[in-house]
Amino acid sequence: IVDAKGNAAAFTGEECFDWAGHIVGQHYACQGNILVSEDTVQAMAHTFEKTSGALVGRLLAALQAGQEAGGDRRGQQSAAILVVREGGGILGFNDRYVDLRVDDHPTPIEQLASLLKLHELYLGETDPDNLVQIQGEVAAEIQEILVRTGYYQGPSTGVYDEATKKALRDFVSIENLEGRWRDDDLLDSVILGFMRERF
C-alpha cells in the first residue's frame, strides 16, 4: 500500500511460495511471490528510484527491470498499469489517467509498452518545447505525405498555405490526433513523427 503522501507498507506471508518478499520506499512498494529470486524486486525498486519523469514511465521501467532480472519463475503472462489522477480520464469524465492491461501474451510487458506508446500518442499532451515550424522542407515533406495519403492534391511547394492547412487538419482529425492540433504554423513533433513512421 502507498498512501497519498508516498508512505509505503507491505506484508509477505510465510505461506507464500519462494521466492517471495517485498521492498518499500518513498512512493513505491515492490513485491511478488514465485519469483526467480530477490533480484526481481531489487531491480524494480532500484529502477523506480533512479528513473525520472512521469509516474507511468517509472512504473513501466520498473516492470521491465523486474522481468530482465528474472521475473516470475513460471514465465510471463500478464501485465497492467493503472494511474489515477482527479479528472485525468478522457475528457475528464473519470479519474483513470492511464488504465492499460495485457491479460494473456507471451511478452506482456513489451505489449504493455506498445499500448502505452499508443496511449501517449492519442491522449498525451503537446509539449510546448517540442513544436516544429511548418515551412520550407518540413512543409514540403508534409505535403508529400498528404499527397500519398490522398488528403492533398496540390504541388509540393514548401509553403504552408490554406489548402495544405486544411488537408493537414483533415488528416489529423481522421487519425484521431486532434488533441495535438494547433491552428497556427507550428506542429506537434509527435504528429510529424507519426506521419513519417506510418506514411
Please tell me what each predicted stretch does.
Residues 1-131, 136:
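N-terminal nucleophile
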Residues 130-199:
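Short acidic, glycine/serine/threonine-rich helix-capping segments at coil-helix boundaries
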